[in-house]
Amino acid sequence: RWFARFRDECLFERINHALVALDRERAGRDASPSAAIIDSQSVKTTESGGPRGYDAGKKIKGRKRHALVDTDGRPLLVEPHTADVQDRDGGGALLQISRGLFPFIEKVWADGGYNHHRVTEATSITVEIVSKIAGQSGFVVLPRRWVVERFFAWINRNRRLAKDVEATLKSAAAFLYAAAAMLMLRRLARSA
């Protein structure tokens, strides 16, 4: 009962937003970032997990989480979709949402999945595609993009988020923001 009320009032999202601004100011930065990194993660859902799709690229039946983090890995926006939503579709929508909350973002780093006019023309934000160097083989840490991958690793430590069990996308988003707020609280507590 309480969770549904907090979810519907976007309380977890507002708490995360306030904690991100507080931590940025504590670090001597402006409250609103000027650059960010965007990526997505596909996760499986349970049988009763509500709306889901199939991500053909990763061969996962479930949901896709699009995340926008600042250059230090602070979670700015997290948006779950069914897994069949392409990065280019979810990314453009996420950047449009970001304009309302973080109007000073000028540049976003992304992977090749976001290399589409739907993303680049969604807002006035410059989208820079970070890709592998030609001829490169094996795993190599890509500049800037590792920050958002680290964020996904952090939230996957939360047992409830390792697999998506929520019946609605709105509830899934609320749990993602609650986990993000918990990360920010730990970060602030360590610096105190």
Residue ranges with predicted function:
Residues R1-A192:
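Short alpha-helical elements
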